Amino acid sequence: MIRVLVVDDSAFMRNMITKFLTSNHEIAVAGTARNGEEALQKIKELRPDVITLDIEMPVMNGKETLKRIMASDPLPVVMVSSLTQQGADITIECLELGAIDFVAKPSGSISIDLYKVRDMLIEKVLTAGRVKLKGRQVPISKPAIETAKQPIVGGSDSVRFRAGKQLICIGTSTGGPRALQRVLPKLPKTLKAPVFIVQHMPKGFTASLANRLNHLSEVTVKEAENGERAKDGWVYIAPGGKNMAVGLEKGELVITLDDRDTESRHKPSVDYLFQSLASLREFEKIAVIMTGMGSDGTEGVKGLLKHGSGTVIAEAAESSVVFGMPKSVINNGLANDIKHVDEIAAAIMTYMKKERA
């Protein structure tokens, strides 16, 4: 049984979340709190397994509460966020600070539409309940030398690709935002390949993730746009709620976004992206599967290896928040290498040099 502390300043939301969670026989609500200060006291008294934490609260907000939880005695936390730009930005910061995942309120802070995310909330709490946090959670630090970077809007200037070039593709889910912050900042701005990323995330949050990663990294990171021409040293993150494919048109890699449902229940889907890349035989692919629940990416990796040459790196169990997606790739015998998240960027660069040799 997973014991949950529900933290929200709205009595309506506390009751609603409690009702949703207790509809699952594996979850019990140990208690509730109206703000962060009260939550910290309840944590000491109740010792819950998981916390659902609202972001916007009086007395002590969710972000400050999360900082204190992670600095003292870390517990798995699922943030509950509003679908606003400010809410999205703060949510990404909370994932950076150590929150396991988040659930978006569909229509603001008080909404009957929360029923739409009931199953997602239950799933994420169950997942969080299986996570064992490893000691004090240290926030991701900025690079020692950093130039001011603005959020990227609009397409990049296209660069015509030569035969035999390389591309990098990354798939991740739960724990992915924090993992990406431990990989992308280590890639050089002179990177001789584009990077395509699928991070399972709902609409409205991937732009904030891209902006944050862009701020931390030497490479340029942006949310992908339909029809955009890809460029070396640029990182393209699939928008939440859309699938991303990459094709070749007149010597240029072109991104296509669409709303079609696929065999994967995820949108964006790692399998969908990787399968589109499989047809690009002119390119050496370096595929990376990192932390996440389930097996999205496994079929896509099979396609990459079946239709062309490629190298597959899977994140090791020791650094994965949820060892699901990488485990599936490893168990299917598809991984060329298994790396701790802090070693993945170096592995990517090593394989790029090998494949160019």
UniProtKB/Swiss-Prot annotation:
What cellular component terms from Gene Ontology apply here?
cytoplasm
Question: In what residue span(s) does the CheB-type methylesterase domain sit?
Answer: 161-355
Task: Name the InterPro entries for this protein.
Answer: CheB-like, CheB_C, CheY-like_superfamily, Sig_transdc_resp-reg_Me-estase, Sig_transdc_resp-reg_receiver
Q: Which UniProt keywords apply?
A: Chemotaxis, Cytoplasm, Hydrolase, Phosphoprotein
Q: Name one GO biological process term.
A: chemotaxis
UniProt-annotated location(s): Cytoplasm
Q: What Pfam families does the record tag this protein with?
A: CheB_methylest, Response_reg
Which stretches make up the Response regulatory domain?
3-120
The answer to keyword Phosphoprotein applying to this record is yes
Q: Give, as one word, the top-level EC class.
A: hydrolase
A GO molecular function for this record? phosphorelay response regulator activity
Annotated EC: 3.1.1.61, 3.5.1.44
- Domains: what does the record tell us? Contains a C-terminal catalytic domain, and an N-terminal region which modulates catalytic activity.
Q: What does this protein do?
A: Involved in chemotaxis. Part of a chemotaxis signal transduction system that modulates chemotaxis in response to various stimuli. Catalyzes the demethylation of specific methylglutamate residues introduced into the chemoreceptors (methyl-accepting chemotaxis proteins or MCP) by CheR. Also mediates the irreversible deamidation of specific glutamine residues to glutamic acid.
Q: What is this protein called?
A: Protein-glutamate methylesterase/protein-glutamine glutaminase
Species in which this protein is naturally found: Bacillus licheniformis (strain ATCC 14580 / DSM 13 / JCM 2505 / CCUG 7422 / NBRC 12200 / NCIMB 9375 / NCTC 10341 / NRRL NRS-1264 / Gibson 46)
